[in-house]
Amino acid sequence: MLRALKTHAEAPIVVATRAASTNAEKLEEIRERLAKGPNFHDFVQNPDNTRNEWEQYDGKLRREKGEEQRLRLPPWLKTTIPVGKNYAKIKAQMRELKLSTVCEEARCPNIGECWGGGEHGTQTATIMLMGDTCTRGCRFCSVKTARKPPPLDVNEPVNTATAIASWGLDYIVLTSVDRDDLPDGGSEHIAETVREIKARNSNIFVECLVPDFRGNLECVKTIANSGLDVYAHNIETVEKLTPYVRDRRAHYRQTLQVLTEAKRFNPNLITKSSIMLGLGETDEEIENTLKDLREAGVDCVTLGQYMQPTNKHLKVIEYVTPEKFKHWEERGNELGFLYTASGPLVRSSYKAGEFFITSILENRKKRQNDTEVPKKQ
């Protein structure tokens, strides 16, 4: 009886050992297949995302009135995950110097390309000044909000200039949160940052994407005369949708006034604005917005697809096709903008150093230098 129990007890052990051996072999086989197969980056990169796939896409691109379900992301809006040494270097330095970027805070889809350098190897980063918390609550933006954000970092202008100087960039974009809690909206802080950057490298082109300062023209003047090259302020959407999309303190006509006055304070500035598409605007409204910007003297305009950052933000009404964006690029150029950047993934500061603005500024500088050279007797 005891012998029988022993034999009976040993049998499962043999079976269990064989099962464990089989499982180990399967696990090793899976590991080998994973090592030889595509990695996570390959999966996200989606190499099949070709123009043919764009043209053949027959998914729904517009939500009808009353529909709650979100639209599926079309193939032309899928981007690669951010990787690479350049990306890691910039991110590490941002943390070390306690700097914020709109690239991260606004969850920009182009962060990997801009920080990594893209196919041309030019790095572009958009520094967000005055912290990562905004006093406004626009319904399209994922930046944190509060009525009274933390105090300004007095070392930020120097830290920002130090970082930018070490990168060796030709073009830098400075943006900021709104700081309605400050008497001057932070305009002097931004201007000081520009001066620090220019003191270290007078050849670098500086673009400032700034708030409306609640229409305070003294603040606009402070920025316009700080030494920057490009004054940018975004109109964001068409006039009809402005109260629905932007914070209640932001006004369509106020934005146009800010852009107009910036040019009046400094006629040598290039002025720039941006429009998001896909929020329910009509073609006629887009056309009128472009005309309003031109009448305000705006030189450059960008048009890009609105993408819902979280479930708490405005839903996308329509995914605009690349062909439609091409139409608006052509229309913008017809209206007389010096440069029109229009595409699904275009953002106000997207690859700023590679845009036409750089060549405009370089040509202006060359003409200025030529006129300053004394003629030979």
Swiss-Prot record:
Organism placement in taxonomy: Eukaryota, Metazoa, Ecdysozoa, Arthropoda, Hexapoda
InterPro entries with a match to the protein in the record: Aldolase_TIM, Elp3/MiaA/NifB-like_rSAM, LIAS_N, Lipoyl_synth, rSAM
Record's subcellular location: Mitochondrion
Family, similarity comment: Belongs to the radical SAM superfamily. Lipoyl synthase family.
Residues that bind [4Fe-4S] cluster 1: 103, 108, 114, 349
Pfam families: LIAS_N, Radical_SAM
Gene3D superfamilies per record: Aldolase class I
CC per GO annotation: mitochondrion
Biological process, per Gene Ontology: lipoate biosynthetic process
SUPFAM superfamilies tied to this protein: Radical SAM enzymes
Domain of life: Eukaryota
Enzyme Commission no: 2.8.1.8
UniProt keyword terms in alphabetical order: 4Fe-4S, Iron, Iron-sulfur, Metal-binding, Mitochondrion, S-adenosyl-L-methionine, Transferase
Cofactor(s) annotated in UniProt: [4Fe-4S] cluster
Species whose genome carries this gene: Drosophila melanogaster
GO terms assigned for molecular function: 4 iron, 4 sulfur cluster binding; lipoate synthase activity; metal ion binding
More info: This protein may be expected to contain an N-terminal transit peptide but none has been predicted.
Residues bound to [4Fe-4S] cluster 2: 134, 138, 141
Reaction(s) catalysed by this chain's protein: [[Fe-S] cluster scaffold protein carrying a second [4Fe-4S](2+) cluster] + N(6)-octanoyl-L-lysyl-[protein] + 2 oxidized [2Fe-2S]-[ferredoxin] + 2 S-adenosyl-L-methionine + 4 H(+) = [[Fe-S] cluster scaffold protein] + N(6)-[(R)-dihydrolipoyl]-L-lysyl-[protein] + 4 Fe(3+) + 2 hydrogen sulfide + 2 5'-deoxyadenosine + 2 L-methionine + 2 reduced [2Fe-2S]-[ferredoxin]
Metabolic or biological pathway: Protein modification; protein lipoylation via endogenous pathway; protein N(6)-(lipoyl)lysine from octanoyl-[acyl-carrier-protein]: step 2/2
HAMAP family given in the database record: Lipoyl_synth
Protein name per UniProt: Lipoyl synthase, mitochondrial
Root EC class: transferase
Cofactor notes: Binds 2 [4Fe-4S] clusters per subunit. One cluster is coordinated with 3 cysteines and an exchangeable S-adenosyl-L-methionine.
